[in-house]
Amino acid sequence: MNLWKIFFAIFVLFSPTITYSHSMEKIQNTYVLVHGMTGGGWDWKLIDNLLSQDGHEVYRPTLTGLGERMHLTHADIDLTTHIKDIVNLIKFEQLDNIVLVGHSYGGMVITGVMNELPEKIQHAFFLDAMVPDHGMSALDVAGKYINFTTKNGLVYPPWLNSKLSIPRDIPHPAKTLTEKVNFDDKVAKKISATYINFTPETLIKRERSINSSWQRAEKRGWEIKTLDSDHNAQRSNPEALKKLLVTF
C-alpha cells in the first residue's frame, strides 16, 4: 500500500508537466490535394512525402475515371462527379479544418467543394489553377486554351503519351469541362485562399495581364504568389512548392 501511495504522489506531482508538454506540441494540418486534368492522386506523391515528413496528414484522392480509377471512365462523368469524389472523402473520413489544394482543372473541383462544405475548410490553394466565378465552366475559364481532340466522350490533350509507363496522364472525361460550377455560398466566398501561378520569372508580367484566373483571384483579395516553374511544379519542383503550401 505504501508503494502505491508513493507512485500516486509521483504521478500527481509530474502530471502538470506532462500535460503542459503535450499542449506545446505543434498542431499540424490536414491537406486534401486535388489533381488536375488527365492526372491522378499519383501526381502528388512527392508532395505527400514532404508534407507527411513534417507531420501533416495528407489525402491525395484520384478523381473518377482517371489514374488508377481509369477503369471507371465513361462519357457521363461530369464536374459534379468529381466534386462529389472530394465531398464524400471529406465526409466519410470525417475531416475538418482542411487545407484544400487544387491544381489546374482541380481549381474547378475545389471551387465546388468550397461551395458545398465551406465550414470544413480553413484555407484553399489554387495552384496554377482555374478560378471560376459562379456559373462558369472550365471551357469558360480557359477559353481558347482548351481545344482538344474529343472521342467517345473523352478529350485527348496533346501532352498525352501512351508510350510512357504507368503512372501517366490519360484521356479526360469531356463533360467535366462543360458543366458549370456553383460558387454562390456566402460563407464559401469568405474562405481565405492563395493563388499561386507557376511561370518563369521573365513571363510574370505578361502572365498577369492575360490570365483571367489570376485576375479573378486578385479581385477577390486573395494572396497572390508565383513560383518559377513549369505547369506541373508538383512533379518538377516539389520542394519549393511544399514550402509555399505550409505558409498561409
Predicted regions span which residues?
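Gly/Ala-rich beta-loop-alpha elbow adjacent to hydrolase catalytic centers
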Residues: 101-102, 106, 110
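Flexible "cap/lid" loop of the alpha/beta hydrolase fold
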Residues: 75, 115, 120-121, 125-157, ...
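Residue in the alpha/beta-hydrolase core beta-strand immediately N-terminal to the catalytic nucleophile
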Residues: 62, 99, 122-125
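Conserved loop-alpha-helix segment in the C-terminal half of the alpha/beta-hydrolase fold
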Residues: 200-228, 235, 248
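Conserved acidic catalytic loop of the alpha/beta-hydrolase fold
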Residues: 83-98
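Conserved alpha/beta-hydrolase
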Residues: 51-71
